[in-house]
Amino acid sequence: MNLQGKQVTVHDMTLRDGMHPKRHLMTLDQMKSIACGLDAAGVPLIEVTHGDGLGGSSVNYGFPAHTDEEYLGAVIPLMKQAKVSALLIPGIGTVEHLLMAKDLGVGTIRVATHCTEADVSEQHITKSRALGLDTVGFLMMAHMASPEKLVSQALLMQGYGANCIYVTDSAGYMLPDDVKARLGAVRAALKPETELGFHGHHNMAMGVANSIAAIEAGANRIDAAAAGLGAGAGNTPMEVFIAVCARMGIETGVDVFKIQDVAEDLVVPIMDHIIRIDRDSLTLGYAGVYSSFLLFAKRASVKYGVPARDILVELGRRGMVGGQEDMIEDTAMTMARERGLTLAAA
């Protein structure tokens, strides 16, 4: 397909999904420096919250270095052209969090649910739209639902007021044909004025290819992260995606070389570990496991002596989804007992 002249809005994930590999401990200075770099590179939309969205600070998901309010309050006043978004997962984030984000200047709210549970988003999507915000319905772990099921869920979110729907490959499981089938079906069912987005993970090295497949299927918003900083093997690496788009004539408005510099000079130096496709993150994609489970599985592996890869395969077999982080340790403990391993002292 000739995509020459196609316009795409690139949405940065470095400061939200990138909080997962940073264990949500990014400093305000790091956040501000990277956000300003992204802004100067021409990235139009930047997401800023705890990795699990507004209100994510908890025993279950991890305590951040600063509150969402502090992160948003530090970044938003510095932006010259970029707008700032916030993720909200019903059951974690509340309407009060949404109102706080709006008051601080957030212009886009992305309401995320598991791909078969769009009905729990009604309150938050309706409120966001009533406040005049750019309102996105975000269907996570989309590989677990058929194209037909995704269509029904997307239509619910559109009906609640979402002006954009995202099909989200949270596990980095999908291949380009999977992406085309799902986004193509959703695009055909939505109103022409409702936008369509894609969020990928690079666990099978498909982030860029899947994002291009999404554009071919009608998506006009694409998530990516500088240096791929995100859960698992990271999100679609933005600097690579932007270069590919430039080669194909897809218009993003992002400077090819400036975004490379942000990735190389600002993001890579703050990584606690190099974001790459190792055996555990590859297993996430292969087994269809939620990408942010990676560090939880690695910690459980150290504690119980069960290889992280084995834990991840079992989580995939059980069909675990986002929000069941507390079950990872339980799974590892059960596997250790079944293998006759001595459990570490509490």
UniProtKB/Swiss-Prot annotation:
The active site is at 20 (proton acceptor). GO terms for biological process: catabolic process; L-leucine biosynthetic process. It is an enzyme of class 4 (lyase). The record marks 16 as: Transition state stabilizer. Gene3D superfamilies: 1.10.8.60, Aldolase class I (3.20.20.70). It catalyses: (S)-4-hydroxy-2-oxopentanoate = acetaldehyde + pyruvate. GO terms for molecular function: 2-isopropylmalate synthase activity; 4-hydroxy-2-oxovalerate aldolase activity; manganese ion binding. Keywords: Aromatic hydrocarbons catabolism, Lyase, Manganese, Metal-binding, Plasmid. PANTHER family: 2-ISOPROPYLMALATE SYNTHASE 1, CHLOROPLASTIC-RELATED, HOMOCITRATE SYNTHASE-RELATED. This is 4-hydroxy-2-oxovalerate aldolase. It comes from Polaromonas naphthalenivorans (strain CJ2).
